[in-house]
Structure formats: structure tokens, C-alpha cells
Regions:
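Membrane-embedded catalytic cores of phosphoryl/pyrophosphoryl-handling enzymes
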Residues: 101-204
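Hydrophobic alpha-helical bundle signature of multipass membrane enzymes
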Residues: 1-112, 121-149
Length: 204
């Protein structure tokens, strides 16, 4: 619903308003986004983190199953949302704000790549599974996806509805995999290897 409202009413107004963002703030948004891209593996591949999480899940599956399940859940959510966002870009073909303005006419199906936001999907698809597993840490976890979403809109690379759609997509994928994997809330990641716990049981 928020995405539809954004497309219908808010997108052009918000895009024109953020076009007045001070230069120093734009620099901060761009540099901050660049730093996050490096930290989260964008120079290697936009999908690198998802594959790393899945590989780590496979490595830990036998000896540290709780940790492996968390890695599998987060990795599957992240990779699926990231891939889905990329495919939807090709489906909707929306122009970016700097391409569509000032004569905004919806800007869909014109061979663009704005809707939904890949950057926003990248970070929201990490936030939602972690927030579902560790609700007590939701607020600090929220910092990165919010920063990236605001930054992408502020620098004119995305409309408001682009990042809202990415958040909604990531939430749906996270909840879907939570149901499939039957992930409990506040999952406890135990540091003790399975072999060690079995040994303790035998001694008892």
C-alpha cells in the first residue's frame, strides 16, 4: 500500500524536495554508501555475501546446527530477495529520478533499472531475518537499512517507492523462509560444538 501511494502521489514530490539536499550531505550519503558497499562485498559481487552465508551454513551444519540454521535462514533470505529485486528491475524498467525528472510521467517500462532498489534490498534482506531472530536488537540493526534507503533517495538514484518496495519484498521473503525453516524467535546460537555436548552427556 505504501509503495502504491508513493508511486501515485509521493514520488515526484519527494524527488523534487530531496533534489535540494545540501552538497555536503550528498557527499556524506555517497561516501557512506561506498564504504558499506566495500564492507559488504559489492566489489566482488552483489551476491557474494549470500553465497558466503550459505557456504558457512553448510560448513557448520553438522557440528553447530543452531548457528548453521541461522546462517542458512539469513543467507537464503538475503540471496532470494537480492535476486528477486534484480529480476523485478528488468520487469518494471523504471527510470531513476535523475532520468525521469522534471517531467515525471510514472517512468515505468522504459528500459530503466530503478524499481525496486537493489541497495535497499541488500540491507533490508539482512535486517528482517535478523530482526525476527533477535528482536531485542531491532533498533541497532535498523540503522544500516534506513541509512542506505534514505541515501539512495537523497542522491537521486531512487524514488521513495523503490526503497519501500525493497523493504516490503525483503520482509515477505524473510517471513516466508521463517515459515519454511520454522525458525524460532530469538534463536540461541550455541558456541559449544555438538561433539562436546555429547561427551558431557556421556560423562553425566
Amino acid at each position: 500500500m505504501l509503495t502504491l501511494l508513493g508511486i501515485a502521489f509521493l514520488d515526484p514530490s519527494v524527488a523534487r524536495w530531496v533534489a535540494q539536499t545540501p552538497a555536503w550531505m550528498l557527499v556524506a550519503f555517497r561516501q557512506g554508501t561506498t564504504v558499506l558497499e566495500v564492507v559488504f562485498g559489492f566489489p566482488v559481487s552483489k551476491f557474494a555475501l549470500g553465497f558466503v552465508l550459505l557456504i558457512a551454513a553448510a560448513v557448520f551444519m553438522r557440528r553447530r546446527r543452531p548457528l548453521a540454521l541461522v546462517l542458512l535462514y539469513v543467507g537464503a533470505t538475503h540471496l532470494t530477495a537480492r535476486l528477486a529485486a534484480g529480476m523485478l528491475k528488468n520487469v518494471f524498467g523504471r527510470e531513476r529520478p535523475f532520468e525521469a525528472l522534471p517531467d515525471y510521467e510514472g517512468a515505468f517500462f522504459v528500459d530503466g533499472s530503478s524499481f525496486p532498489s537493489g541497495h535497499a534490498a541488500h540491507f533490508w534482506s539482512l535486517f528482517f531475518p535478523l530482526a525476527l531472530l533477535f528482536p531485542r536488537y531491532r533498533l541497532p540493526l535498523l540503522v544500516l537499512p534506513l541509512f542506505v534507503s534514505v541515501a539512495r533517495v537523497a542522491v537521486g538514484d531512487h524514488f521513495l517507492s523503490d526503497v519501500i518496495a525493497s523493504a516490503a519484498l525483503s520482509a515477505l521473503v524473510a517471513w516466508g523462509f521463517a515459515y519454511i525453516f520454522r525458525m524460532p524467535r530469538d534463536e540461541r546460537i550455541e558456541a559449544v560444538p555438538v561433539a562436546s555436548k555429547e561427551a558431557v552427556t556421556e560423562e553425566a
